[in-house]
Amino acid sequence: MANQIDESKPISDLEIMRHSAAHIMAEAVLSMFPEAKLGIGPAIDTGFYYDFDLPRTLTPEDLPEIETRMNQLVKSNLPFRREEMSKDEARKLFANQPYKLELLNDITDETVSIYRQGNFCDLCRGPHVNYTSKVKAFKLLSIAGAYWRGDEKRPMLQRIYGAAFLDKASLAEYLNMLEEAAKRDHRKLGKELELFSLHQEIGGGLVNWLPNGAIVRHLIEEFWKKEHLKRGYDLVYTPHIAKVDLWKTSGHWGFYRENMYSPMDIDGEEYVLKPMNCVYHILMFKNRTRSYKELPIRMAELGTVYRYERSGVLHGLSRVRGFTQDDAHIFCLYDQLEKEVVKVLDLAKFMIDTFGFTKYKVMLSTRPEKYVGELDKWEYATDILAKALEANQIPYQVDPGEGVFYGPKIDIKFEDALGRTWQGPTIQVDFQLPERFDVSVVGEDGKDQPVAMVHRTVLGSMERFMSCLTEQYGGAFPAWLSPKQVMVIPIADRHTEFAEKLACELREEEVRVEVDSRSETMNQKIRQAQLAKIPYMLVVGDKEIETQSVAVRTRTGSQQVMPFAEFKSMLLAKIKTKSTEI
């Protein structure tokens, strides 16, 4: 197998180089810890990692030494050499590497390949760069725990992450982005701005929304509800638990059980926390006999669901165990499907544009290995989604095998201010659940007619969307979403009455405003408001009282004196239009 770099494929070249960087790091670690046991070391989106079983716990202070040894290996210009051997020969070579032996046992071919560079060899398909000197721009970033093969019952290994790029300028740009991302981390900002809290006494992945975060969530939800009502959806509410038999009928118990919580016994029957809202909406639809003339019927719910996540993958608001989906299910005739998906795409684009996400990529995820239903219906559903994307002139990529067990789906991933992608709207066509629950309508001929179903979210979960929104704006939310929109700052005590009068006028317009009448200096009050990321500060003193004006300071530092009436008009316009500009 060739291991040459193909310069006509820069993305592939980058992946090859990153994989080679992982091997170089493994050799460096082995030079420090000769008794180390090796896991795996692949290339990933921004670099590489390698998993190690080591005699002691690594600390961040170890990374510079590992990096120094890597640089020495790079300067040595060592060749990467590919060899093929029998599995028996490989077992002898890796006799002291139990994880490699386990991987060898999983390989069905009798011949395997290894790669060597310097004093290091690894079980590997490759390809790699020709020489270590080709790995020119890398940086070790962090250490984390990782269970062997992702199984919590297996040993915990130590994973070292690194970044790697084709040139130092690209690496520097990425490291700057990481530095900015750390400042915007929603976990850090969530604490500083008092948006949410997590408590071990409650349990991992279960979120408390604090007043500031609750206001932002409320505003998002109110906007969501109004927009859905405007577009012909009916709002519904459903319980948080249901009998296990319901999930057996739906197929979730067979296909999704590992993500569900254990049943609880209630009056001798087994109940379980719901992982999804769809089955409840199906039963609502079946609540009475329906005519084909009533379709489409669109049910929307901000429904809280519970899914088991391993403790090691929980992450602030973006990976939790209990979350609220902006969920909806559309029941329609087969010939209405394409039109309904087109409408959902239009709604999804409108929603994410409103929140300031203008760049996104779209994936069409097709049938997975584990699925239910007939192949012809899968193909028909996939074709419907593709036609809807094309009708909206939305470019997309096919993501083979990434659909859900009951149908294909469209995934829209939007890009934030730092160029990172986040999971956004999802649209799924489903013929299987309606069949399992015998969902039908009375057709034009008086006979039962089958119904298709569209599952969709436009924001994802409220928790994950809030984490994304917080990092997109660095906690400095647009005025319409800010927990506090205005802080009025009287220069002296004698100006407090005027400040309160202005605040009262703003409250009558439902503006979220406070007066800072503390006995602090004006500069201290301004600084405090800026740290709280309040969009507007209105400083008032003798001149402002005399002219009925305000000295407006924005959180970005710009200043302007204007009549209070003009400021109020400007602010209300920004709130009404949901402007992302201050």
UniProtKB/Swiss-Prot annotation:
It is an enzyme of class 6 (ligase). Zn(2+) binds at C278, H329, H455. It comes from the Bacteria. Its cofactor is Zn(2+). GO terms for cellular component: cytoplasm. It catalyses: tRNA(Thr) + L-threonine + ATP = L-threonyl-tRNA(Thr) + AMP + diphosphate + H(+). It holds the Pfam family HGTP_anticodon. Binds 1 zinc ion per subunit. Its main location: cytoplasm. GO terms for biological process: threonyl-tRNA aminoacylation. Its EC number is 6.1.1.3. InterPro entries: aa-tRNA-synt_IIb, aa-tRNA-synth_II, aa-tRNA-synth_II/BPL/LPL, Anticodon-bd, Anticodon-bd_dom_sf, Thr-tRNA-ligase_IIa, Thr/Ala-tRNA-synth_IIc_edit, ThrRS_anticodon. It is found in: Cytoplasm. Residues 185-478 are annotated as: Catalytic. GO terms for molecular function: ATP binding; metal ion binding; threonine-tRNA ligase activity; tRNA binding. Keywords: Aminoacyl-tRNA synthetase, ATP-binding, Cytoplasm, Ligase, Metal-binding, Nucleotide-binding, Protein biosynthesis, RNA-binding, tRNA-binding, Zinc. PROSITE patterns: AA_TRNA_LIGASE_II. Belongs to the class-II aminoacyl-tRNA synthetase family. Homodimer. Catalyzes the attachment of threonine to tRNA(Thr) in a two-step reaction: L-threonine is first activated by ATP to form Thr-AMP and then transferred to the acceptor end of tRNA(Thr). Also edits incorrectly charged L-seryl-tRNA(Thr). This is Threonine--tRNA ligase.
